[in-house]
Amino acid sequence: MKLGLTGIETSGPSDEQAVLVLGGKHVGELIAQRLQADGYSVGLVDETHDSEAVPTNAGDPSDVRILAEAGAADASVVVVATPRDSRNLLIAQLVRAHFDVTDVFVLVNSPDRSDLVADVGHEPVCATTALSEAVVADLEPTVSELDTA
């Protein structure tokens, strides 16, 4: 029997690939659900959302005590996904300062802030860029039909 980040038996890639998602309400939950569906050991920390699909610790993801209770020390990957860039950077810095986490991915809403996040050692994921690329990709077949009409 192999136990993951949340103490729940997992058949995922490995305990070394435990992922902790911090904040993000529905976005954070969906990230956690998709990772869990791919077989990763996943936990979620969020102030207002209690997921039935993913083990969730209710609490402030900027509280080091809550992060410790959620298993941040056992995570090899943390995804910080609150709606505010400044808060995401603060939480990412707390994770780096207090826990030995290999990779910290930070959701960035403003593309202008991606370089700042990268400069301090985190992996930025720009929500604006990802969303706009997804919308354009979905619209492309419809728009190309208009060009041929």
Regions found by a protein language model. Give the residues of each.
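Cytosolic regulatory regions of ion transport systems
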Residues: 1-149
